[in-house]
């Protein structure tokens, strides 16, 4: 059975291609929040939020104010979605690149990035120079990204490289724990 967590079960209507842009982002986020609960009422950036499903979950389940930040999904689209979901007073849609975040230094209590960090965070200096400065001292950074059980080789690596249009830098972000 896919759904066994009651907290996630409430959101099963969103488990469609329209909202999910990768693995089950709510399952990943829920597991992370179990280990690292956020302070209710805190200010959180959902970096790489996509269609805002993780922002919805953060607002409803963690009780935080969310800055739903994404480069690929227009903020206006997310604003409409957030209004429809009744969270427009708790979640602010932001259209921004992780390399040029429009926030003051030390602005966030936490930064969450579920299934997105590997798109922008693998480049040297992005985390320390672009992302970390907007996190308050003592703040929490939570990230979950795809991984593989074994190193990619042979046909699997060739297919993934083809899918990534030959960009070896992107392929280099997929490694197993033993790497």
Please give the residue ranges for each predicted region.
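N-terminal, positively charged/glycine-rich alpha-helical extensions of SAM-dependent methyltransferases
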Residues: 1-13
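Conserved SAM-binding loop and adjacent beta-strand
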Residues: 14-30
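Class I SAM-dependent methyltransferase SAM/SAH-binding core
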Residues: 45-47, 51-100
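A short acidic, Gly/Pro-enriched loop at the edge of an enzyme's catalytic core
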Residues: 99-111
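A short SAM/SAH-binding and catalytic strip from SAM-dependent methyltransferases
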Residues: 110-123
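A short glycine-rich, Lys/Arg-flanked "PGG" loop and its adjoining helix->strand segment in the class I
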Residues: 125-140
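Conserved class I S-adenosyl-L-methionine
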Residues: 140-166
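Acceptor-substrate binding/catalytic loop of class I
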Residues: 160-178
